[in-house]
Curated annotation (Swiss-Prot):
<comment type="similarity">
    <text>Belongs to the universal ribosomal protein uL5 family.</text>
</comment>
<dbReference type="InterPro" id="IPR020930">
    <property type="entry name" value="Ribosomal_uL5_bac-type"/>
</dbReference>
<keyword id="KW-0689">Ribosomal protein</keyword>
<dbReference type="Pfam" id="PF00281">
    <property type="entry name" value="Ribosomal_L5"/>
</dbReference>
<keyword id="KW-0694">RNA-binding</keyword>
<keyword id="KW-0820">tRNA-binding</keyword>
<dbReference type="InterPro" id="IPR022803">
    <property type="entry name" value="Ribosomal_uL5_dom_sf"/>
</dbReference>
<dbReference type="GO" id="GO:0019843">
    <property type="term" value="F:rRNA binding"/>
</dbReference>
<dbReference type="InterPro" id="IPR031309">
    <property type="entry name" value="Ribosomal_uL5_C"/>
</dbReference>
<dbReference type="GO" id="GO:0003735">
    <property type="term" value="F:structural constituent of ribosome"/>
</dbReference>
<dbReference type="Pfam" id="PF00673">
    <property type="entry name" value="Ribosomal_L5_C"/>
</dbReference>
<dbReference type="InterPro" id="IPR031310">
    <property type="entry name" value="Ribosomal_uL5_N"/>
</dbReference>
<dbReference type="GO" id="GO:0000049">
    <property type="term" value="F:tRNA binding"/>
</dbReference>
<comment type="subunit">
    <text>Part of the 50S ribosomal subunit; part of the 5S rRNA/L5/L18/L25 subcomplex. Contacts the 5S rRNA and the P site tRNA. Forms a bridge to the 30S subunit in the 70S ribosome.</text>
</comment>
<dbReference type="GO" id="GO:0005840">
    <property type="term" value="C:ribosome"/>
</dbReference>
<keyword id="KW-0699">rRNA-binding</keyword>
<dbReference type="InterPro" id="IPR002132">
    <property type="entry name" value="Ribosomal_uL5"/>
</dbReference>
Length: 179
């Protein structure tokens, strides 16, 4: 069992139930899924760039990503309908908790000039999104083998009813928010 899943079931649930004054244990917020998204606009010019991005995302997530295609042609961006422009991965279950563990303990502390996560990135329903400017923060990515530095978006979807519950859940997991 993943370390954070065990920690959630044994400690976080009881702590949040009393902290949020919830009656039922099923009301305690939980993380449903984590979505990783990497936009690769340069892939329209060179197909190799997309391959490198897919390899990076596969190494980070431990799961094969899905290539996202453009929905319509945009002349200003020089892309056509149906061209590959990004990749995404949705993590659930054990892999989600393993990724969350690596994100909190290894990747976030390795971010340059890090002063804490913004508490304003909640969407109003308890879900949290953050962007990373460099994929090299993850230990799976070898700096010598990458072609360029790419960022990625991380969306954490929770069962929380509002931002306060979502913030309490992520703080219980050890997310370093700005105070």
């Amino acid at each position: 069992m993943a370390r954070l899943k065990d920690y959630y079931q044994n400690e976080v649930v009881a702590k949040l139930k009393s902290e949020l004054n919830l009656d039922n244990i099923m009301e305690v917020p939980a993380i449903k899924k984590i979505t990783l998204n990497m936009g690769v606009g340069d892939a329209a010019k060179d197909k190799k760039i997309m391959t490198f991005a897919l390899n990076d995302l596969t190494a980070i997530a431990g799961q094969k990503p899905v290539v996202t295609m453009s929905k319509k042609s945009i002349a200003g961006f020089k892309i056509r309908d149906g061209w590959p422009i990004g990749a995404k991965v949705t993590l659930r279950g054990e892999r989600m908790y393993e990724f969350l563990d690596r994100l909190i303990t290894i990747a976030i502390p390795r971010i340059r000039d890090f002063r804490g996560l913004s508490a304003k990135s909640f969407d109003g329903r308890g879900n949290y999104s953050l962007g990373m400017k460099e994929q090299i923060s993850f230990p799976e990515i070898d700096y010598d083998k990458i072609d360029s530095i790419r960022g990625l978006d991380i969306s954490i979807t929770t069962t929380a009813k509002n931002d306060d519950q979502g913030r309490a859940l992520l703080k219980a997991f050890g997310f370093p928010f700005k105070s």
